[in-house]
C-alpha cells in the first residue's frame, strides 16, 4: 500500500541505505529516525514517488549514479515536498564534478538556496552533499504588494546654526498699541454743528458745504427739479446749485471727495 504522508523521506538507487545517512536526515529534519520512510532502488520506480503532493517535510537522496537523478525525478521530489521543505542529495565523488551537475538540475527544477558542502572524511563512499530548499509559496498563490510610501524629506538642522528670535526684530514702536482716532467727539446738539476743537471731521464737512453755498438738506437729501442734476456737470444747467459736484442719485447723500477743497494749481 502506497504511503501518502511522511515527515521525512530517504531514497537511494542502491540496494541498501546506510544507517548513518538515515540518522543525518532525521537530525536535519528534526524528527526521530523511526519517522523516516526509506525507499531503495528508486530507479525502478520510473521517476515516480508513492506520495501525495506536498506531503513530505524533507527528502534525502543518496545517489550513486548521477544519471539516475534526472530532471523527471527532480520534478517528482519537488512535487512531494511541502512548501519550504528541504532536500539533501549525497553523491559519490567518483563521478566527474557531480555536484555542479546536480546543483544545475536543482536550480532548473525551481529549488532555491542551493549549496554544496565539502567532502566528508567519515564516509568516503557518499561524501558530496548538496542542500537545497523548495520555495515557500505554492503554484498559483497570490499576495498583496505593499506600496512604497514616500515620506517628506527630513530637514537636518545643525546645532551650531544661529537661530534668530522673531520678537527681537520688532522695535518698541511696533509693540505699541495703535491709537485709533476718536469718532464723533463733537458735543453737538439739535443743530449738529461742529464744536470748536473738532477732531472727528465734522468741521471739514461743514466747510465744504459752506464753500458750495448748499444747505445740509441739499447735501444729505439731494433733489432735482429738472431731473438732470444727478447726472453730472455735462447735463446741468448754468444756474444748477450742484455744479462741480460728482454725480448722485436723488435722495442719497452726496459723497464729497477728500481733495474737494484742494486747489487745482
From Swiss-Prot:
Short sequence motif Cx2C motif 2: positions: 237-240
HAMAP family xref list: Anamorsin (MF_03115)
Task of the protein: Component of the cytosolic iron-sulfur (Fe-S) protein assembly (CIA) machinery. Required for the maturation of extramitochondrial Fe-S proteins. Part of an electron transfer chain functioning in an early step of cytosolic Fe-S biogenesis, facilitating the de novo assembly of a [4Fe-4S] cluster on the cytosolic Fe-S scaffold complex. Electrons are transferred from NADPH via a FAD- and FMN-containing diflavin oxidoreductase.
Family: Belongs to the anamorsin family.
Main location: cytoplasm
Cellular-component GO terms for this entry: cytoplasm; mitochondrial intermembrane space
Gene3D superfamilies referenced in this protein's UniProt entry, alphabetically: Vaccinia Virus protein VP39
Cross-referenced PANTHER family: ANAMORSIN
Binding site for [4Fe-4S] cluster: 226, 229, 237, 240
Region (Linker): 144-175
Keywords of the record: 2Fe-2S, 4Fe-4S, Cytoplasm, Iron, Iron-sulfur, Metal-binding, Mitochondrion
Swiss-Prot/TrEMBL cofactor(s): [2Fe-2S] cluster; [4Fe-4S] cluster
Motif (Cx2C motif 1): 226-229
Region of interest called Fe-S binding site B, as start-end residue ranges on this chain: 226-240
GO terms classed as biological process: iron-sulfur cluster assembly
The protein's name: Anamorsin homolog 1
Subcellular location: Cytoplasm; Mitochondrion intermembrane space
InterPro entries linked: Anamorsin, CIAPIN1, SAM-dependent_MTases_sf
MF terms (GO), sorted A to Z: 2 iron, 2 sulfur cluster binding; 4 iron, 4 sulfur cluster binding; electron transfer activity; metal ion binding
Amino acid at each position: 500500500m502506497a504511503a501518502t504522508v511522511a515527515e521525512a523521506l530517504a531514497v537511494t538507487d542502491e540496494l541498501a541505505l546506510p544507517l548513518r545517512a538515515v540518522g543525518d536526515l532525521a537530525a536535519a529534519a528534526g524528527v526521530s529516525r523511526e519517522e523516516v520512510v526509506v525507499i531503495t532502488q528508486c530507479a525502478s520506480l520510473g521517476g515516480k514517488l508513492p506520495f501525495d503532493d506536498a506531503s513530505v517535510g524533507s527528502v534525502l537522496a543518496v545517489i550513486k549514479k548521477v544519471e539516475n537523478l534526472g530532471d523527471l525525478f527532480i520534478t517528482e521530489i519537488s512535487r512531494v515536498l511541502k512548501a519550504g521543505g528541504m532536500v539533501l542529495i549525497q553523491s559519490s565523488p567518483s563521478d566527474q564534478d557531480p555536484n555542479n551537475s546536480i546543483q544545475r538540475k536543482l536550480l532548473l527544477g525551481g529549488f532555491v538556496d542551493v549549496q554544496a558542502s565539502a567532502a566528508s572524511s567519515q564516509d568516503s563512499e557518499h561524501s558530496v552533499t548538496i542542500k537545497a530548499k523548495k520555495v515557500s509559496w505554492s503554484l498559483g498563490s497570490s499576495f498583496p504588494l505593499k506600496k512604497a510610501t514616500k515620506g517628506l524629506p527630513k530637514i537636518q538642522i545643525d546645532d551650531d546654526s544661529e537661530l534668530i528670535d522673531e520678537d527681537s526684530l520688532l522695535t518698541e514702536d511696533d509693540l505699541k498699541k495703535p491709537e485709533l482716532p476718536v469718532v464723533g467727539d463733537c458735543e453737538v446738539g439739535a443743530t449738529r454743528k461742529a464744536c470748536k476743537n473738532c477732531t472727528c471731521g465734522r468741521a471739514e464737512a461743514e466747510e465744504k458745504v459752506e464753500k458750495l453755498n448748499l444747505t445740509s438738506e441739499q447735501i444729505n437729501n439731494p433733489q432735482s427739479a429738472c431731473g438732470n442734476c444727478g447726472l453730472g456737470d455735462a447735463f446741468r444747467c448754468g444756474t444748477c446749485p450742484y455744479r462741480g459736484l460728482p454725480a448722485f442719485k436723488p435722495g442719497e447723500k452726496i459723497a464729497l471727495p477728500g481733495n474737494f477743497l484742494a486747489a487745482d494749481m
